[in-house]
A protein has these predicted regions:
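Topology signature of small-to-medium multi-pass alpha-helical membrane proteins
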Residues: 2-204
Length: 204
């Protein structure tokens, strides 16, 4: 018969700090990739503007059999070069890089778990929002681009591309969120009350 449950007087061992440190390494790497993405988007936007500035739709399409469709095609490319996607995407990537710095430091130090996780969740939220925004803006142009191509039955392709693009972003962000949930669970504060076991049961 169980008469009592033994409660250990010794301090309970805390969770491993390497869960938070692992999150710090992962977000740190993604932060560096965000910096590279910010630079590439900024330079890409400048290059596209320069390229389209040298293109004259009327001159390019002068000898085309269907001048109107040719000019519509060139115009759709011009719209792509002038999209806010380049500037806003670069700004989002730069923000993710800057936000990753304090997030990585807090996670690596593993001293203030709650604050570190708040920064980490904030980083994941900004990352998710930016990815869905960039994907949405690109697919909006993508649909217009295929409308300018004089080939029928392309509607299925744009729908299929949208499904894959949004689905891919959703899976990526859910994976990040799941990883952060796991880190939150593994680093939760321990309790001093130990579960009863055969070693902690006193029988009289």
């Amino acid at each position: 018969m169980i008469d009592s449950i033994h409660v250990s007087q010794a301090g309970v061992e805390g969770p491993s700090p390497w869960w938070l440190k692992g999150g710090a390494i992962f977000i740190g790497v993604l932060g560096l990739l965000s910096l590279l993405n910010a630079v590439s988007l900024a330079l890409g936007g400048i290059a596209m503007d320069a390229m389209m500035g040298e293109m004259d739709p009327e001159e390019i399409c002068a000898e085309d059999e269907d001048t109107e469709e040719c000019e519509d095609f060139i115009e759709s490319i011009a719209q792509f070069s002038s999209m806010p996607l380049w500037d806003i995407g670069a700004a989002f990537s730069a923000l993710l890089f800057l936000l990753s710095i304090p997030t990585t430091i807090l996670l690596w130090n593993a001293e203030d778990r709650d604050m570190a996780l708040k920064f980490a969740w904030g980083w994941v939220f900004v990352h998710a929002f930016s990815q869905f925004y960039i994907t949405h803006e690109f697919l909006e142009w993508y649909g217009t681009f295929f409308d300018s191509i004089p080939i029928e039955d392309f509607q299925w392709l744009t729908q299929f591309t949208s499904f894959l693009s949004y689905g891919g972003v959703l899976m990526c962000e859910l994976t990040l969120a799941a990883g952060l949930v796991l880190i939150s669970y593994k680093t939760r504060p321990p309790t001093k009350l130990e579960a009863p076991s055969a070693f902690h049961v006193n029988n009289e």
